[in-house]
Regions:
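Acidic, surface-exposed loops and disordered segments
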Residues: 1-200
């Protein structure tokens, strides 16, 4: 029946190892940290493709699958993007790779979907950050997004990268082989962060 519907596989959780997988995933989440210093070494295309596949596997609104990914490896192009973005993202200059997530805004037709492309991109970005860390690499999410205060800068980036006007720039990841050690930063306590039934 699934083949007739064009579905090749259905994901079925494996009960025998689900507990171990859950622990491994949780430790992966706890261990991931933002890295802003990298070696100059480039990452292979096969590793980059695996990172993007992790992004493609993320949930997205109405299964639109609008996330597109532009990978920058050329140093001059990376510097051009970094100089355009500016702000507190000077670490972009040091990155051996930039990964830019864009979304086709024509696929979001209703007024209440104005933030939906950013949500779709954020889910993909988190998946990719975890995959990058799992591969022994380091990354930092630059949180660059399309908004009115950055519209002129965004136009420059779009022109530089040949991005059509009907696409949002939804986020940028800088990544590569880490050249720094990142200390553990305590997170907010669960007792101060969770509320049942209503906010207090």
């Amino acid at each position: 029946e699934n083949k007739q519907r064009g579905i090749k596989e259905i994901y079925e959780p494996n009960e025998t190892n689900s507990q171990t997988a859950e622990i491994d995933l949780y430790q992966l989440m706890l261990g991931r940290r933002s890295v802003r210093e990298w070696k100059k070494d480039k990452i292979s295309d096969s590793m980059i493709e695996l990172i993007v596949k992790a992004g493609l596997s993320a949930p997205n609104s109405c299964n639109r699958q609008t996330n597109k990914f532009i990978i920058l490896k050329d140093e001059a192009r990376i510097r051009s993007v970094a100089s355009t973005v500016k702000g507190g993202r000077n670490f972009f200059y040091k990155a051996p790779h930039l990964l830019i997530v864009i979304n086709d805004i024509r696929r979001y037709q209703f007024p209440d979907e104005i933030h939906t492309p950013f949500q779709d991109a954020a889910a993909a970005i988190q998946n990719m950050l975890l995959m990058i860390y799992r591969m022994g690499l380091g990354a930092c999410w630059g949180s660059y997004t399309s908004n009115t205060s950055l519209i002129l800068r965004e136009k420059k980036v779009k022109k530089l990268l040949n991005i059509p006007s009907h696409y949002f720039i939804s986020g940028i990841i800088a990544f590569g082989k880490p050249n720094m050690r990142v200390c553990f930063i305590p997170r907010a306590d669960i007792s101060d962060s969770i509320y049942f039934e209503k906010f207090k």
